[in-house]
Structures are given as C-alpha cells and as structure tokens.
Amino acid sequence: MAHNHNHDHNHEHQHEVITLVDENGNETLFEILLTIDGREEFGKNYVLLVPAGAEEDEQGEIEIQAYSFTENADGTEGDLQPIPEDSDAEWDMIEEVFNSFLDEE
C-alpha cells in the first residue's frame, strides 16, 4: 500500500514506535501511523505502519504496511498478522478509514 504523502510537514507527528522481528530474527523499527478498531465488523483490530525515518520516494509516496493485531493483556506486545489479500471487505474498510485520516491531516 503506497501513500501519497501530500500534507503540511510544518507540524510535529508524535507516532509510537514498535519493533518488528522477521523470521530471520532481524529487528526493524516502525512508526504506528494509525490504529483501526475493526472488532465490531471483523473481530480484530488493525494497525498501519511506516518504517521509522522513512523518506518519501520521487512521487512523494511512502510505503505503508497494514496488519491485523491482537494485543497482549499487558498492552506491551502483541501478534501482528498479514491481512489476506483476498479479503476485499477488510481492505475496503482499511482504505476508507485511511482516506478519512488523510483528509483530517
């Protein structure tokens, strides 16, 4: 999912940072761009992430990763799961919420 990042950069963003560990044990920092409560419709929550310190490409876009997540009871860790590519209803909901988020920025 690419994001055309056209909004005012003269304000500070206070994003939480999380660490993702891949299957090889490599750690990568990501900023939490947006969380979405999808429990009522899909029974899970979603998170949109951008690599920490990511820069826009030539087209002014930044790659955004979307996951469903289940938070541990203590709120410090949780499990991220890829969203199935064929789950059109989930992707439509995420895109709708994300576009509303961009409109508010």
From Swiss-Prot:
Pfam families: DUF1292. It comes from the Bacteria. InterPro entries: UPF0473. Signal peptide: none annotated. PANTHER family: UPF0473 PROTEIN CBO2561/CLC_2432, UPF0473 PROTEIN CBO2561_CLC_2432. NCBIfam families: PRK13678.1-2, PRK13678.1-4. Belongs to the UPF0473 family. This is UPF0473 protein SAG2089.
